[in-house]
């Protein structure tokens, strides 16, 4: 079985016998039901392949669709002129980078269909290209724009440049409305949907498919599709990892499923990660190998965002569906970029509860954030997560605390604002990362932060104080009886009181007490 990893051409996919999860029935429905569409989905979710599939369909390439659902549905297979603008191929850091891209595409189209020498602006030239393409071929035009939002995403944090991009693209896309009589179909795709003064404000007849239940599986794969199309690699993956097929499916679901684009919707798998897993027969973090956009961290830092709120956010459809570039709320960007997804829906109030879609995204995103909030880097051996976990599994609380203290003392404070927020965010990240390897319960409320960490042979109860005392923290563990759930547990128990100095921005004291108490010792 050949897996179309990175294959964005439908023609190449079909001619070279790559596996294809058939989405053509939905493509046919879109073509029959309407004319203008918009779709946002996370990166690496198959948007470009979808655009290529639609291009092949409207080019009348019946030969490429043999055996697929649309082969039985479509009778005419008309060939339409296609205007395909792919904005994903460039890096946009100046106005010229965008105008050069539009100029190149317009020149190509004008050579094919004709040019009006009087037309000067991009928008006017585009209008004439649409009209001339119709007049020359006798068929209405199909317009496909892939990653329409990439210029604006790369300009997040630069409001002036973003406004320039918006002004250019707003007029350019507005040509679709003025030339409606010459157009058969139009689809614009991207990662995000920008609101307020949108590039689509002149094109108000777009149907947004992003939260349309009928097309929630237009990109990505459902569990049924995974089982139907990939039985062979699932069996091979099970054998390679010494798992049953049921265990393999459960692990795939935990790792790569979990995207929900509508309320009470079905779970959608990330296709890129899934195909890489089948190709390599190894569970990995493939989505993050292709890079995490730095603008996400910039948004979180800009607002001094409280990271624990990532999995506690409640939002409305209006917020999820639209990004305001001057807003300090990063939630809509994180949702549309695929780092958060819908976990629950309150129909009475129209509210969505958000969270990480799956283990791959949660682990990868938190690992990506670690260097920005702590001194923990993968390349810094003393602070590697493996050594943290090694200390915990081997019953070395003193070494563990030394590493924790060193972690906070080695942080780049230039990016840190509020000291308490800094500690809360760093505390959250370290606890969550340890939670992928050990059982960790974290509590943060009323100025109190604590951890309960469980390994096979050891239990650690850790109480933190901010500008307090390690002795008081340890005393609170004993007085509140935080160790009571483990009194009958055969594992070794350690109680640890820790103080974090907000002024020094470091852990300045801790106290460790084995239980049952056989003597306590201090670190000052």
Describe each model-derived feature in a short phrase.
Residues 1-419, 434:
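Phosphate-binding site recognition
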Residues 427, 451-466, 480:
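Conserved catalytic cores of phosphodiester-cleaving nucleases, focusing on short active-site segments
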Residues 132-137, 430-456:
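Active-site metal-binding core of divalent-cation-utilizing nuclease and nuclease-like domains
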Residues 142, 458-460, 494:
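Structural motif
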Residues 162-167, 466-483:
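Mg2+/Mn2+-dependent nuclease catalytic core
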Residues 485, 491-524:
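Domain-level recognition of nuclease-like catalytic cores that cleave nucleotide substrates
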Residues 172-179, 332-340, 428-432, 476-496:
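Metal-dependent nuclease catalytic cores in nucleic-acid-processing enzymes
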């Amino acid at each position: 079985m050949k897996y179309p990893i990175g294959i964005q051409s439908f023609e190449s996919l079909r001619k070279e016998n790559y596996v294809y999860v058939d989405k053509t029935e939905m493509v046919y429905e879109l073509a029959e039901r309407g004319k203008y569409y918009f779709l946002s989905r996370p990166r690496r979710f198959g948007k470009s392949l979808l655009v290529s599939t639609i291009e092949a369909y409207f080019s009348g390439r019946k030969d490429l669709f043999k055996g697929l659902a649309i082969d039985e549905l479509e009778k005419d297979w008309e060939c339409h002129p296609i205007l395909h603008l792919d904005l994903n191929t460039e890096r946009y850091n100046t106005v010229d980078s965008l105008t050069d891209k539009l100029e190149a595409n317009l020149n190509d189209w004008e050579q094919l269909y004709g040019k009006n020498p009087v037309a000067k602006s991009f928008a006017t030239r585009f209008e004439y290209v649409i009209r001339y393409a119709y007049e020359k071929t006798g068929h209405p035009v199909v317009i496909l724009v892939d990653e329409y939002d990439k210029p604006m995403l790369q300009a997040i944090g630069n409001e002036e440049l973003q406004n320039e991009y918006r002004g250019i693209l707003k007029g350019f896309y507005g040509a679709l409305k003025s030339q409606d009589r010459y157009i058969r179909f139009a689809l614009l795709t991207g990662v995000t949907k920008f609101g307020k003064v949108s590039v689509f404000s002149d094109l108000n007849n777009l149907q947004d498919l992003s939260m349309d239940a009928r097309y929630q599986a237009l990109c990505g794969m459902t569990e049924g599709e995974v089982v139907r199309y990939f039985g062979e690699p699932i069996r091979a993956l099970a054998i390679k990892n010494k798992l049953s097929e049921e265990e393999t499916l459960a692990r795939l679901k935990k790792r790569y499923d979990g995207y929900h684009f509508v309320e009470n919707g079905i779970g959608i798998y990330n296709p890129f990660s899934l195909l890489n897993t089948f190709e390599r027969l190894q569970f990995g973090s493939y989505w993050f190998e292709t890079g995490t956009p730095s603008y996400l961290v910039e948004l979180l830092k800009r607002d001094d965002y409280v990271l624990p709120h990532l999995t506690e956010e409640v939002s409305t459809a209006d917020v999820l569906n639209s990004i305001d570039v001057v807003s300090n709320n990063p939630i809509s960007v994180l949702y549309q970029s695929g780092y958060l997804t819908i976990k629950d829906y309150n129909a009475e109030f129209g509210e969505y509860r958000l969270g990480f879609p799956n283990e791959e995204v949660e682990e990868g995103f938190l690992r990506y954030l670690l260097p920005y909030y702590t001194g923990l880097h993968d390349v810094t051996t003393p602070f590697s997560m493996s050594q943290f976990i090694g200390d915990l599994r081997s019953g070395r609380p003193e070494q563990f605390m030394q590493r924790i203290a060193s972690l906070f003392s080695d942080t780049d404070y230039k990016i840190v604002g509020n000291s308490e927020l800094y500690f809360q965010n760093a505390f959250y990240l370290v606890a969550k990362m340890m939670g992928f390897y050990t059982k960790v319960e974290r509590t943060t409320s009323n100025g109190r932060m604590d951890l309960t960490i469980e390994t096979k042979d050891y239990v650690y109860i850790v109480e933190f104080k901010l500008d307090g005392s390690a002795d008081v923290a340890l005393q609170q563990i004993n007085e509140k009886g935080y160790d009571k759930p483990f009194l009958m547990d055969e594992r070794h128990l350690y109680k640890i009181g820790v103080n974090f100095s907000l002024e020094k921005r470091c852990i300045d004291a801790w106290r460790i007490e084995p239980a049952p108490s056989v003597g306590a010792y201090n670190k000052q």
